[in-house]
Structure formats: C-alpha cells, structure tokens
Amino acid sequence: MLVLSSVLGACAQDATGTLAAPSGERVYAAQGCALCHGSDGAGSSFGPTLHGKARYWTREKLVAYLKAPVAYAEADPRLAEQKKRYSLPMRQFDKVPESELAAVADYVLHLP
C-alpha cells in the first residue's frame, strides 16, 4: 500500500485536476532508486553514481536499460564490467509506466 501511494504521488494533479507529467525525482524516490544509488544519485556500495551519465546514455537507451538491465548489460562491455563491482543486480522496471521511466531518465541525465 505504501509503494502504491508513493508511485501515485509521483504523478501529481495540476490545478485543473488533470494528471501532470511525472516528476523524475519523485519517481526516483518512489521506485526505491535511492536505496542503491543514494538520495542524490552519488552512488553507494550497492550501486554506481548516476552523475555524469549523459555522456553514455540517451533518454531512449536509458529507458530501454531500465526495462531489461540484465539483457542490456550483457550486450554492453562497459556495463558488464561495472556489474562485477556490485553485489546486487540492477532491478528490472518493466512494469513501470513508460512516462515514469522517461521522467527518471530525464532526471538522471540532468545530474551534473
């Protein structure tokens, strides 16, 4: 129930009562990304920093990765090597709406 309310909170209603575009920062928090990547995306012993990812990723590629990280990493030597440094695998977000994944991707790609 808590997860559902957190996810619904990521898509706030605007002044007209219609759903506004999801906030990437809110979706990041609601989906638990901070548990491994830190509340500010600086990384931890469970997941790499998310700062500076714009040099490696486009929005479309990052959304595809979030949907199927294991398969994506197998085809990318840089990700396969990075995966060896962390004990937890990247969670698959294939059930998360595309608009929310795109919002998270935009948020991550704008981290310095």
Describe the function of each predicted region.
Residues 1-9:
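Sec-dependent bacterial lipoprotein signal peptides
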Residues 10-29:
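Electrostatic cytochrome c docking/interface patches
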Residues 11, 33-36, 90:
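Disulfide-bonded cysteines in secreted/extracellular proteins and peptides
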Residues 14-17, 42, 110-112:
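Inter-heme linker and motif-flanking segments adjacent to c-type heme-binding CXXCH motifs
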Residues 21-25, 38-71, 87-95:
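Gly/Gly-Pro-rich "capping" loops immediately C-terminal to redox-active cysteine motifs
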Residues 24, 30-39, 62, 104-108:
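The canonical Cys-X-X-Cys-His
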Residues 69, 90-91, 98-112:
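Thiol/selenol-based redox catalytic cores and closely related redox-interacting motifs
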Residues 71-77:
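Proline-centered turn/helix-capping motifs that create local helix->coil transitions or kinks
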